[in-house]
Amino acid sequence: MSKLRLKIGIISLSFMSMSALVVTNAYSAIIADFPNEPIAKIQMIGTIPSLGSLITTLFVGVLAMKCPKKILALFGILLTAIGGLVPIFFHSSINLLLGFALILGIGIGFMNTLSPMLLSEYFEGEERAGLMGIGTAITSLGSVVMMLGGGLLGASNWQNTYYIFLITILIFLLVLINLPMDKIIQKRRLIKRASPP
């Protein structure tokens, strides 16, 4: 696999890093649709993903030693898609939206944790530092695209804001095609061989 494809596969994970903020575009419309719900509770839709991401960081490192990072990355993107797209169809209560926001945060947590891990695994020195800089730029670009796109889509109906998460399909395909599969079994064998008798 070429280095360019590998870089694309890893860097693309950074695009969704700030995507949980998309729903903040729709706060006023959601508040109007749920007048009996506390405003603070509605605002949690944009903040609870951070809790999901925090939870994820606690165990992704352990999972990465037992499961290929590519599988974990694809799983994270899938969770992000579920948390971001299902609310288009199921949005009858704030509790539902909060649940999907938590799932969204967990998915984002997978991607945010795995991206630097993969860069450290496949690249070294100045090349790694340069790619981390590019990753930061992609994160900023993704934030702008997601916020702007979500705002435009949700102009007439706040539920349409979530359509911006269709971008996860593209990210999923980029990772699926360009990121190599980790050989976890081989790593275990090497560790076993290196162990003293």
Label the model's feature ranges.
Residues I55-I94:
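Conserved MFS/SLC helix-loop-helix module at the cytosolic interface between two early adjacent transmembrane helices
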Residues A29, L58-V62, L152:
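Membrane-interface helix termini in secondary transporters
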Residues I134-P180:
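Helix-loop-helix hairpin linking two adjacent transmembrane segments in secondary transporters
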Residues R5-I39:
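Extracytoplasmic
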Residues L21, P49-L58, S143-V144:
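Residue-level signature of mid-helix packing/kink "hotspots" within the transmembrane helices
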